[in-house]
Amino acid sequence: MEVPRLDHALSSPSSPCEEIKNLSLEAIQLCDRDGNKSQDSGIAEMEELPVPHNIKINNITCDSFKISWDMDSKSKDRITHYFIDLNKKENKNSNKFKHKDVPTKLVAKAVPLPMTVRGHWFLSPRTEYTVAVQTASKQVDGDYVVSEWSEIIEFCTADYSKVHLTQLLEKADVIAGRMLKFSVFYRNQHKEYFDYVREHYGNAMQPSIKDNSGSHGSPISGKLEGIFFSCSTEFNTGKPPQDSPYGRYRFEIAAEKLFNPNTNLYFGDFYCMYTAYHYVILVIAPVGSPGDEFCKQRLPQLNSKDNNFLTCTEEDGVLVYHHAQDVILEVIYTDPVALSLGTVAEITGHQLMSLSTANAKKDPSCKTCNISVGR
């Protein structure tokens, strides 16, 4: 069952009663966790209704969950509705001046449990929530008798599934544009980074955990280990641009060293940062590697020879590479890469820090790169 949003005055189990303007049911004002009611409440005097306990949350997705609980059998047959108080868990480190999320009050008819709560307008992926429940009995005159609030339970929503990522992929397909030829992947860093790799890692760049840039629900953020590469080219030269936001030293490696018939290609994300530029994250993983197994379970796999973002085809016995022109590709390679496989040199352009996507937050209002689930 999909639970509609309650658009009436409900109180939180952990806050005083508040007036909330809403839609269609009779005006309801529930009690706070201690059972206190305002004088003008439309709820009848408290009668004994079973209080939900032993609450269980399962089947959690990025925008839904199933909830069930136990109740004493006494007066159970009088229950007509359930009231659910759902709130984002307070983040003590959040900006205290930031607008606070409005608590979500839900109402549902008393249906057999477990009950599915679904709604992308109030549930976001990978977000911690608290939930509490009341049982209620609607009276002939429209008033409600309610139980005390249950205990407060915490849970966290899930990442985007393959289904959601496929929806993002389809949106990215629309704007990818024509394909341009390229021959090298490159990675910019500070000189100190490459010195450290030589001294401490045996001359091989090591995968690291991906940051939280991009879609909030992306299953690779904070989980997938890899090394970021770019492959963009300048339209007039066909070569990598001389500017970079990530450092003045660039490692270049022939495309076939990273992307070839022995690797798999996956779609990871599609996002923008309040600008006209859109980014597509792709993952290249050697077949059978830990990174490949991680992606196979979570990400849509692309045909390396035929997709709208990054291709590897064979022409006259030679591998030929193309990248999309109208999106900026961020390519993650999931295995270590030896510096000896390429070259490191200083770029002649500028270090444009403003273009960095490190921990960049996705614009949740962009219609081009958002789907109808939490952002």
UniProtKB/Swiss-Prot annotation:
Residues linked to a glycan: 22, 36
Entry-annotated residues carrying Phosphoserine: 11-12, 15, 24
Positions of disulphide bridges: none
Xref: Pfam families: fn3, PHYHIP_C
CC annotations in GO: mitochondrion
SUPFAM superfamilies: Fibronectin type III
UniProt entry keywords in alphabetical sequence: Glycoprotein, Phosphoprotein
Positions of the Fibronectin type-III domain: 51-160
PROSITE patterns: FN3
Family (UniProt): Belongs to the PHYHIP family.
Functional note: May play a role in the development of the central system.
UniProt protein name: Phytanoyl-CoA hydroxylase-interacting protein-like
Record organism: Mus musculus (Mouse)
